[in-house]
């Protein structure tokens, strides 16, 4: 089962050790998923904050896939 994180700071720490990050855009929410060796972590972000969050995630993630 995926682990949903509520804190962006906590998610950034996970992204640093993630193998792959994925961005899935919906109508009301943008989901950012970070796959580590053991778990899949998700963070839900409103579309208004998407740009600032993705900017930080792109800097730390090794492999970013946009769906």
Curated annotation (Swiss-Prot):
Matching Pfam families: Ribosomal_L38e (PF01781)
Entry-linked InterPro entries: Ribosomal_eL38 (IPR002675), Ribosomal_eL38_sf (IPR038464)
GO biological process, one term: translation
Keywords assigned by UniProt, alphabetized: Ribonucleoprotein, Ribosomal protein
Molecular-function GO terms, alphabetical: structural constituent of ribosome
Gene Ontology CC: ribonucleoprotein complex; ribosome
Family label: Belongs to the eukaryotic ribosomal protein eL38 family.
Name of the featured protein: Large ribosomal subunit protein eL38
Native source species: Aeropyrum pernix (strain ATCC 700893 / DSM 11879 / JCM 9820 / NBRC 100138 / K1)
Gene coding for it: rpl38e
